[in-house]
Amino acid sequence: MTAEAAMVLPAMVAVTAALVWVLSLVLGQVRVVDAAREGARVAARGDGEAAAVAAARRVAPSGATVSVVRSGDTVTVTVTARLDGPGGVVGSLPGAEVAADAVAAVEVGV
């Protein structure tokens, strides 16, 4: 191994780890958005708050918090999750909190 390669290899590993971390944050955000949408859909159908929370938690990352607020003819579901950093060699990368809201119109007759 040349000296140049020995100098570049740690930087390449760090950049790769950072890219994996960013990708995991993006995937976590997508799961939170999907969970909020699913919860809002169930709540808008009239299945009740407990069913909406359960539906959202099935899709959300583990440990996520789900809230359902019904206001007039709309229902808003908010999902928030704390995503841990990657740990290991790159343990200095922080975790992040991701959140999403979904609003749905309550179906007529519900």
Regions found by a protein language model. Name each.
Residues 45, 49-110:
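Short, conserved structural patches
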Residues 1-51:
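Alpha-helical assembly-interface signal, strongest on the long, hydrophobic N-terminal helix that forms
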